[in-house]
Curated annotation (Swiss-Prot):
It is found in: Endoplasmic reticulum; Golgi apparatus; Early endosome. Expressed in the brain, retinal lens and muscle cells (at protein level). It comes from the Eukaryota. This is Amyloid beta precursor protein binding family B member 2. The lineage of its organism: Eukaryota, Metazoa, Chordata, Craniata, Vertebrata. Residues 413-580, 586-738 form the PID domain. Residues 212-230, 261-275 have a biased composition (Polar residues). One of its GO terms (biological process) is smooth muscle contraction.
Length: 760
């Protein structure tokens, strides 16, 4: 009968198989059971690979949910490739039997020592030799048990890892069927669950389990600080919290007393609780400092000395300051860090702070997020991670700046205002979206579109500073985006060119700020959105104040311009003592060389008979030699007669508006016009023209018609209505009618006499 021994393990059990005989092994391998084509991963494959190791004490078992690293398994034995140095141990001679017994004795001795000192670990060399013997030795003599045999699954060199795993699973199933009648414990305890298997000692006896203790879930376990190799640490800023979560899942669950007694199975790595564990901070470039806050390390490299926050991957030049536990919830992100600091509501706490702040427990939601980030890494973040590393490598080369210098350089102008922001990108807008009543809705939609989809920062297109922290400065009527590291200006926008600005209206969007302006290169309207560390209402208020100031300055400048213009006007209205009124240069003046017969007063202002009688009287009273030569200048408004000998002597000056009648006499060489001098006095001036008076008469006629047109245009519309007819004896009526009649008769006379004068 099989002897049932108690096992002092409350966490889990592990099945360890020993070879019964060579024939049994062959029969097991040739059994009709077909290996499965799929891998059943309900239990950790590392536990199944270690199923051939026999343990006499259940304290050496691991917790059911604590999975050991791949490095804890001898890879050559798992793949069926045994070490050549131990290949002679595979024989069936007596030497092999002796080695098996020696190995069993060593295991029992180790178990007794483990009971005395549960926290003592075996040396790696002894464990490696012991494991090699147990994995490679096969007992040729069968051992009888109480009605049931334990069939081993011996890996062969010619089989692959998958074949070996399939045989191992088949053996486990057959063992479960054979052990059914002889188990002395309950069925629910005998069946191995995920990560569990019944404990079997070397002679085939089954060890019962103690009542299961409450298993610690990942949510209830206390999280320790992340430790990894130096290579992992170098890559840590790139992967961020996901790498920490992966290492946390493998290594950093709170170790139990049973787990602390496990020894390593390989020389490549040590147990998580082993004193031989490789410390990441053993590297000379990483130095521990007890004065630093939890999760911070000091790093020395070619760039200088800086500080690295392990959980978030944040690096900074300044020494971090310890923050009390009650202030963790209100911590602000550091603007001097290379990577973007999260907002206070989304800020993650360091791993070492979870146990203190949460009472030794992890929130289930946080655990699920960490688990999802580890199992399903997001490949779309590779581009952003690459940009982050490039940005970090550039900024770490710069010398650190002091806080005093930063504040002085940013706030050099006392009226300048600076805000910590992070760009979320821009969205193109149409002109009609900025119409009154639509602009606020359009800007809020842009804030929604960019703020909701940028939670994970999927891309860096259109994002100033590749999504990093920066300063938004309002100074000298300019909105500037300044790099917090080297104080370089990433973008500048004149405030007067900003069309619209606004703040997010949705719940939780009070920190989102947006403004709309036209791009100076593409001339398209862009709505730029930023995430602020403080409520964005402060930026909007500052912009409003600056715009009000600009409008007031413009209003004052306009008032000054109007006052100066009025002063100039008042100065121009002062009447000078002497003024010259030049003749308009646009006035057309025609000059004719004629002879002036003289002037004769007449009784009537119009009439050809009056004109002809005046011409005959002047021609008969003087000879042609006595007629002086003069220049007649015919302009639009004036007819002037100037002496040819003395150009400054004006003989006659007649305004066209006072010319009452004109015409050509019976002789085509004679030309005369009647001028109204006022007080019912009229004068008739007579001229002798060569070769005829046609050109002179046409010039004077054109001047009269132009003057008439100007009078019609200058008259207001209300005065264009024909006035009532004047009295019959009115001089005005008679003068107007006679002028028209005289002009028409002159035209008829010229038409009749022109062919005669031109005949030779």
């Amino acid at each position: 009968m099989s002897e049932v021994l108690p096992a002092d393990s409350g966490v889990g059990t592990l099945a360890v198989f020993m070879a019964s005989s060579g024939s049994t092994d062959i029969a097991n391998r040739n059994s009709p059971a077909t290996p499965p084509n799929t891998l059943n991963l309900r239990s950790s494959h590392n536990e199944l690979l270690n199923a051939e190791i026999k343990h006499s004490d259940a304290k050496n078992s691991t917790p059911p949910k604590c999975r050991k690293k791949y490095a804890l398994t001898n890879i050559q034995a798992a793949m069926g490739l045994s070490d050549p140095a131990v290949q002679p141990l595979l024989g069936n001679g007596s030497a092999n039997i002796k080695l098996v017994k020696n190995g069993e004795n060593q295991l029992r001795k180790a178990a007794e020592q483990g009971q005395q000192d549960p926290n003592k670990n075996l040396s790696p060399a002894a464990v490696i030799n012991l494991t090699s013997e147990k994995l490679e030795v096969k007992d040729p003599h069968p051992q009888e048990s109480s009605g049931c045999e334990i069939l081993p699954s011996q890996p062969r060199r010619t089989k692959s890892f998958l074949n070996y795993y399939a045989d191992l699973e088949t053996s486990a199933r057959e063992l479960g069927q054979n052990l059914g009648p002889c188990q002395g414990v309950g069925e629910e305890k005998a069946q191995p669950g995920p990560g569990q298997a019944p404990v079997v000692i070397g002679n085939g006896d089954l060890l019962p389990q103690k009542p299961n203790k409450p298993q610690s879930s990942p949510e209830d376990g206390q999280v320790a600080t992340v430790s990894s190799s130096p290579e992992t640490k170098k890559d840590h800023p790139k992967t961020g919290a996901k790498t920490d979560c992966a290492l946390h899942r493998i290594q950093n669950l709170a170790p139990s007393d049973e787990e602390s007694s496990w020894t390593t199975l390989s020389q490549d790595s040590a147990s998580p609780s082993s004193p031989d564990e490789t410390d990441i901070w053993s590297d000379h470039s990483f130095q521990t400092d007890p004065d630093l806050p939890p999760g911070w390390k000091r790093v020395n490299d070619i760039a200088g000395t800086y500080y690295w926050h392990i959980p978030t991957g944040t690096t900074q030049w300044e020494r971090p300051v310890s923050i009390p536990a009650d202030l963790h919830g209100s911590r602000k992100g550091s603007l001097s860090s290379v990577t973007p600091s999260p907002t206070p509501e989304n800020e993650k706490q360091p791993w070492s702070d979870f146990a203190v702040l949460n009472g030794g427990k992890i929130n289930s939601d946080i655990w699920k997020d960490l688990h999802a980030a580890t199992v399903n890494p997001d490949p779309s973040l590779k581009e952003f991670e690459g940009a982050t590393l490039r940005y970090a490598s550039l900024k770490l080369r710069n010398a650190p700046h002091g806080d005093d210098d930063d504040s002085c350089s940013i706030n050099s102008d006392p009226e300048a205002k600076c805000f910590a922001v992070r760009s979320l990108g821009w969205v193109e807008m149409a002109e009609e979206d900025l119409a009154p009543g639509k602009s606020s809705v359009a800007v809020n939609n842009c804030i929604r579109q960019l703020s909701y989809c940028k939670n994970d920062i999927r891309d860096t297109v259109g994002i100033w500073g590749e999504g990093k922290d920066m300063y938004l400065s309002l100074e000298n009527d300019m909105l500037s985006l300044v790099d917090p590291m080297d104080r370089s200006v990433l973008h500048s926008q004149p405030i007067v060119n900003i069309r619209v600005w606004g703040v997010g209206r949705d719940n939780g969007r009070e920190r989102d700020f947006a403004y709309v302006a036209r791009d100076k290169d593409t001339r398209i309207l862009k709505c730029h959105v930023f995430r602020c560390d403080t409520p964005a209402k402060a930026i909007a208020t500052s912009l409003h104040e600056i715009c009000s100031k600009i409008m007031a300055e413009r209003k004052n400048a306009k008032a000054l311009a109007c006052s100066s213009l009025q002063e100039r006007t008042n100065m121009s209205l002062d009447v000078p003592l002497q003024v010259d009124f030049p003749t308009p240069k646009t006035e057309l003046v025609q000059k004719f060389r004629v002879q002036y017969l003289g002037m004769l007063p007449v009784d009537r202002p119009v009439g050809m008979d009056t004109l002809n009688s005046a011409i005959e009287n002047l021609m008969t009273s003087s000879s042609k030699e006595d007629w002086p030569s003069v220049n007649m200048n015919v302009a639009d408004a004036t007819v002037t007669v100037i002496s040819e000998k003395n150009e400054e002597e004006v003989l006659v000056e007649c305004r066209v508006r006072f010319l009452s009648f004109m015409g050509v006499g019976k002789d085509v060489h004679t030309f005369a016009f009647i001028m109204d001098t006022g007080n019912q006095r009229f004068e008739c001036h007579v001229f002798w023209c060569e070769p005829n008076a046609a050109n002179v008469s046409e010039a004077v006629q054109a001047a009269c018609m132009l003057r008439y047109q100007k009078c019609l245009v200058a008259r207001p519309p209300s005065q264009k209505v024909r006035p009532p007819p004047p009295p019959a004896d009115s001089v005005t009526r008679r003068v107007t009618t006679n002028v028209k009649r005289g002009v028409l008769s002159l035209i008829d006379t010229l038409k009749q006499k022109r062919p005669v004068t031109e005949t030779p």
